[in-house]
Amino acid sequence: FVTKEGKKYYLKSGKKLKSIILETKKYKYLLDKNGVVVTGWKQYKGKYYYFDRTSGKMAIKKKVDGISLDKYGRAKKNKLNVSKINTMINARKTVNKVCKVSDTKAQKLRKCFDYIAKVPYRRYRFLKPIYHKKGWESTFADDVFDKGSGCCVSMSAALAFMLHECGYSTVYVAHDSEHAWVELNGRVYDALFARAKDYNKYYNLSYSNFSCHPVDKRKI
């Protein structure tokens, strides 16, 4: 393996291998059409696989992001799983557009927050009637990733998925059934309120200084 400008490749006889699943003695890796080692979720030949977000190693016989993988690394396919995987794939694509490979996690957090804070506001549906159901966080996040706009729930869900791709593990979409925000490490990140009210206040805010109280939150 070689790393160039933050991207990992595999060379054989001095040439990059491309568009294949590479098997080493211990692990499998997916190399894309440019020879880059794939990280995160990926669809390959009609199946979904997960490759460690840092190393690119294929995961097998375990649960990742709440999704079961078989001994070949294939994700269990059902409507909820496929929806969440596609949302995570789109979140990763967006992070790659917004952030540099060399950015620190803190820099990525700020850049992702700033990006979401600029998303045009549009409400496609109400959260209150459906928040007891599974999968609404993917549905709302897709408003931003697929349509480029959304409400506070859409913005918060999209930001939460993006931060998850940046390597943050304790990320939640929290809400009071009408307004939503991101909870990260017990702190509030509210992109819509930041834009509409006070930009710096609603970035890394303590709950003691926040006017909303969560009735529900979903871990990404």
Write out the residue ranges for each language-model feature.
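Extracellular adhesion/carbohydrate-binding repeat motifs centered on closely spaced tryptophans
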Residues: 1-89, 175-176, 181-184, 199, ...
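Short polar catalytic/cofactor-binding loops
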Residues: 7, 120, 194
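Substrate-binding/catalytic groove segments of enzymes
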Residues: 57, 122-127, 188-190
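Active-site neighborhood of thiol-dependent amide/isopeptide-bond enzymes
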Residues: 117, 124-180
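Hydrophobic/aromatic-rich core segments of domains that either
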Residues: 154-215
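Basic, glycine-rich
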Residues: 217-220
